[in-house]
Amino acid sequence: MSPSIAMFTLTPNARALASKTSKMDLIKNLRERTGAPIVDVKAALTAHDYDSEAAYDALRAKGLAAAAKKAGRTSADGAVAALSGDRGVVLFEVNSETDFVARGESFQSLIKECAEATLRAVESDRAMTEEHGTATAGALRALRDERIGELLTSDGKPLSDAVRDVAVHVRENVRLRRAFAYAATVGAGEVIGTYVHGALAPGVGKQAACVVAKGVSEEFANKLAMHVVASSPLYLRSDCVPTDVMERELAVFRTQTEGSGKPANIVEKILAGRMNKYYEEVCLENQKFILDDSMTVEKAVKAEGGELVAFSRVKVGEGIEVEEKDFAAEVAEAVRTT
């Protein structure tokens, strides 16, 4: 296998692939995504002209699909790193093809160099995160791929070149996938907490999270980051949920209540209750605190006299779809070409 490097390979939207993907593939993918019976999957796709997202919503409305929060698929390997300093924090993901490579010294040195280079840039130039990052309410900024590749290692080498060198050394595809950064506001009393799960080395593991808060201790902020890794929230609070996401959830819930025969005012109360339940699942402040489930995260933070500012979580390979290979066919092809 010849080594190569790709920057920020992201999962395409299912709708965009519809014209290029066979009907059997769409059925297979939606079946794996939802766990619904194949008969229902095929019926939903047929009813919606093989629009997989519309079919997915229809299956959810019938209670045949897994919750959106659990629908993500993690396939790719590699490692993530969390690194904080006095004036900022970064989360970084580098992908490899195998866990064996991810545990190797050269790969772990690479991801540490990536995190250190990014943190140096963030702390030396606060504007960098604003000029080269995409803002999302309540989250760290997602840095653009072209800027990450230009950052320099401690010996002056661009990160893109450092990745290429490691790819050549380990003989695998290695890629800088994504980075999130936060530049702390001087004098604002912001506290940064981090947590790394599945540690491969100090600050490097399979999943990591960062929480930025005010008015709490660093120890408590680290506990909040641990909660983020354990509970996988998607948004900081309910007002951070994008309007289109909220409308989509409401539409699914409304479809589920159709034909119930209940008065309109009762239906609206049911919808409000289901939305509140949704917020409890996906919003950090609304979740039950893992260290004390008698209160929400928001109440736990307020009990410490603080408030949440932002958070982000990164899990190795999350959102990347990897082609499933027929092992027997792969071996046969290898024999044929040797």
UniProtKB/Swiss-Prot annotation:
Keywords attached to this entry: Elongation factor, Mitochondrion, Protein biosynthesis, Transit peptide
Superkingdom of origin: Eukaryota
Gene Ontology biological process terms from the UniProt entry: mitochondrial translational elongation
Presequence boundaries: 1-42
Keyword Disulfide bond on entry: no
GO molecular function: translation elongation factor activity
Organism of origin: Ostreococcus tauri
Localization per record: Mitochondrion
Keyword Mitochondrion: yes
Function (record text): Associates with the EF-Tu.GDP complex and induces the exchange of GDP to GTP. It remains bound to the aminoacyl-tRNA.EF-Tu.GTP complex up to the GTP hydrolysis stage on the ribosome.
CDD domains: UBA_EF-Ts
Name of the featured protein: Elongation factor Ts, mitochondrial
Pfam families reported for this sequence: EF_TS (PF00889)
InterPro entries (UniProt xref): EF-Ts_dimer_sf, Transl_elong_EFTs/EF1B, Transl_elong_EFTs/EF1B_dimer, Transl_elong_Ts_CS, UBA-like_sf
GO cellular component, one term: mitochondrion
Family affiliation: Belongs to the EF-Ts family.
